[in-house]
Amino acid sequence: MPLIIRIWALLEKINNMAFSKEEIAQRIAKEIKDGFYVNLGIGIPTLVANYIPKGINVVLQSENGLLGMGPFPFEGEEDADLINAGKQTITTLPGSSIFDSAMSFGMIRAQKVDLTILGAMEVSEHGDIANWKIPGKMVKGMGGAMDLVASAKNIIVAMQHVNKAGESKLLAKCTLPLTGVNCIKKIVTELAVLDVLPEGGFKLLERAPGVSVEFIRQSTAGKLIVEGEIPEMKLD
């Protein structure tokens, strides 16, 4: 069998083992504690609203001006006047509050949010994040991520481990314009759960079922730290 076909077959096998975007969100939801106020960024983070563990009281914030965001609506039950920061239709929970974005960012800058979950294009081994611009591509603006990374107490990144070209997004140093520096604490990808250590480096905590540590190592351009046996990621 030609080498290129063997490589393609291996990648297909890994893709089948790796977590979906929904499963990434479900794994991140396990990090949420009772009583938390949580900001959900655009992309994969918005899916977390569908997987809040039962039995805990959590208030989800959307930066466009909402406290008490619920899961996505069922088909046919959408209300076009209720959207999140990513312009997706949402639901609200009893006791929810709607207000202007100035008040929303006042909450963020005053560090009233316990946990922020963001998407990213790149994260460095020192916790730097790039998630707002790819040079040469038109963007409407920076968005709210820079306020969040400057003010949040705890930030988890939900992202794909590699880009569409198969290049790692977990780097020694970010190549894209930065959103914030030394601010990311944890990363969840389709392949792994990793801590970003204060001294630098990605510490591997969990791996997707069927995905080897060696494959994660090959998919990580920054410093990967592996200690002992690495358990598989669990969703329940």
Regions found by a protein language model. Give the residues of each.
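Intrinsically disordered, low-complexity polyampholyte segments enriched for Lys and acidic residues
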Residues: 12-16
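N-terminal active-site beta-alpha-beta segment that forms phosphate/nucleotide-binding
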Residues: 17-93
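Conserved phosphate- and dinucleotide-binding cores of soluble alpha/beta proteins
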Residues: 19-23, 74-236
